[in-house]
């Protein structure tokens, strides 16, 4: 029976690949990577580098921004680069607008010299190839922009083996390795099919180069904008994240350039009021877990609800009722033999988790609920305890899985908390400690929930009792009535 339940996470990629890590609202926006999360009043701390000044001049020359009265300018901030307000701004005020001709997306690739070669590729792969080719071209139109992009971030895809060892036991480690394996497989494919046969068009591209491009896109690309699948927007992608901002609404939009203009613009707004000299921030995604933030951007937050753990539950193909259970699951929105449930620290269990657990564990004398006569009502029955044996089984299996997962970490929660309290940690170690401590807290929460449920097994009302009550065969004291007295 234990083989029917597992706790793990699957790699999650761009929207072209079905994400398995989270069932919460999927991210609609990927942005630049701050190494840490600072206060809303984080000021610029230094003069921009020559590369940033060259980039700014390029934007001015192209008419993207006004050289005389800019609303924001790039600046050195604790996160790296950010957008610094040049005057006071009100909430929802436009920060910048970038015309479509200055976006980098699959259309940009299609109209380039390598466009014909990239027609059948995944959008992110084609844009990654474009970035690497343009980066090697000293005369590239995009050179000023490419020069300000970081060589790497604190995203876990850039970590060394020693750094990754700090993630031992975590779902984030499995996800990171899965993502890197996925990127490598895509690289080997295009290397053989596109890069090597067209050496005159491409520089010498390595796996590390391709990982760099993937990381840039994952952290900076706006995705699922209206009519757009994947877009890099110079200047706009310097906007940093701040956990103090608790809304994602109205931070950006695609709009027309005006009554007599055919231009399409990306418009970025500030979600809060900002003083001149302060950094402008947005909220990247309220639905992301710390593991997702670490993978995508290279930071974590202290908010408890950023800590999540994914329970992976499976209907075994060897189950004699496999077909019936699969049909019932799919009829209730859980497609396929595997289902993923995100458990968030401090939150209740997902509504479909217990019914699905009961379904997977269903067997023996409870299997009658799988008969076709119950097909339209079975999920309603599964929302309540079916039998003591069924409920006891799911409690035991889930608790065993939690204990097994907890034994895979090399530190305890107390040891992690002591490290975090001590401060002065390397940024990547701080991420690792934060993620593994958060995962363990969630696992302990899950274990506690099912431990308490085990203690209530004798007090729960099961299907047969409910059925007898419905038939009027249970007395006021809970005794079964076999016949009515004359």
Identify what each model region corresponds to.
Residues 2-80, 100-114, 136-141, 202-205, ...:
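Charged low-complexity "KEKE/polyampholyte" interaction tracts
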Residues 94-97, 279:
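Residue-level marker of beta-strand positions
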Residues 121-125, 233, 303-307:
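A short, structural micro-pattern
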Residues 118-133, 141, 147-148:
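Conserved, structured regulatory domains from eukaryotic proteins
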Residues 43-82, 135-286, 322:
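Catalytic core of the SET domain in histone-lysine N-methyltransferases
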Residues 98-99, 105, 242, 283:
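Residue-level recognition of conserved beta-strand edge/terminus positions
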């Amino acid at each position: 029976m234990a083989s029917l339940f597992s706790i793990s996470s699957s790699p999650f990629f761009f929207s072209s690949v079905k994400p398995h890590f989270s069932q919460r609202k999927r991210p609609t926006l990927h942005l630049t990577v701050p190494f840490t999360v600072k206060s809303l009043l984080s000021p610029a701390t230094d003069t921009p580098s020559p590369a940033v000044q060259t980039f700014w001049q390029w934007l001015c020359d192209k008419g993207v921004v006004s050289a005389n009265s800019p609303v924001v300018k790039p600046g050195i901030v604790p996160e790296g680069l950010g957008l610094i307000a040049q005057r006071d701004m009100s909430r929802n005020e436009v920060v910048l607008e970038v015309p479509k001709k200055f976006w980098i997306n699959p259309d940009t690739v299609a109209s380039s010299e390598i466009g014909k070669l990239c027609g059948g590729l995944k959008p992110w792969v084609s844009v990654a190839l474009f970035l690497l080719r343009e980066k090697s071209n000293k005369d590239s139109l995009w050179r000023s922009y490419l020069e300000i992009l970081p060589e790497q971030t604190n995203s876990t895809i850039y970590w060394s083996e020693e750094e990754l060892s700090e993630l031992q036991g975590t779902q984030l480690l499995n996800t990171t390795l899965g993502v890197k394996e996925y990127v490598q497989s895509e690289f080997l494919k295009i290397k053989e099919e596109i890069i090597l046969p067209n050496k005159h068009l491409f520089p010498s591209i390595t796996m590390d180069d391709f990982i760099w491009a993937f990381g840039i896109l994952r952290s900076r690309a706006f995705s699922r904008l209206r009519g757009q699948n994947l877009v890099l927007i110079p200047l706009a992608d310097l906007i940093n994240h701040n956990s103090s901002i608790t809304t994602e609404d109205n931070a950006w939009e695609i709009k027309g350039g005006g009554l007599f203009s055919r231009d399409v613009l990306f418009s970025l707004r500030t979600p809060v009021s900002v003083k001149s000299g302060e950094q402008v921030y947005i909220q990247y995604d309220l639905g992301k877990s710390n593991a997702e933030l670490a993978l995508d951007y290279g930071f974590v937050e202290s908010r408890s609800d950023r800590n999540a753990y994914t329970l992976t539950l499976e209907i075994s193909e060897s189950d004699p009722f496999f077909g019936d259970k699969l049909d019932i699951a799919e009829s209730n929105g859980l497609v396929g033999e595997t289902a993923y449930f995100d458990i968030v620290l401090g939150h209740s269990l997902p509504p479909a988790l217990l019914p699905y657990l009961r379904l997977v564990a269903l067997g023996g004398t409870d299997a009658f609920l799988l008969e076709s006569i119950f097909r339209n009502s079975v999920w309603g029955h599964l929302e309540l305890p079916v039998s003591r044996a069924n409920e006891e089984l799911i409690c035991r299996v889930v608790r065993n899985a939690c204990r097994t997962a907890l034994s895979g970490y090399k530190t305890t929660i107390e040891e992690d908390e002591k490290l975090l309290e001590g401060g002065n940690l390397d940024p990547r170690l701080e991420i690792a400690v934060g993620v593994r401590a958060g995962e363990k807290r969630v696992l302990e929460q899950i274990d506690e929930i099912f431990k308490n449920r085990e203690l209530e097994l004798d007090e729960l009302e099961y299907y047969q009792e409910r059925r007898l009550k419905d038939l009027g065969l249970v007395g006021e004291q809970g005794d079964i009535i076999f016949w009515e007295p004359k």
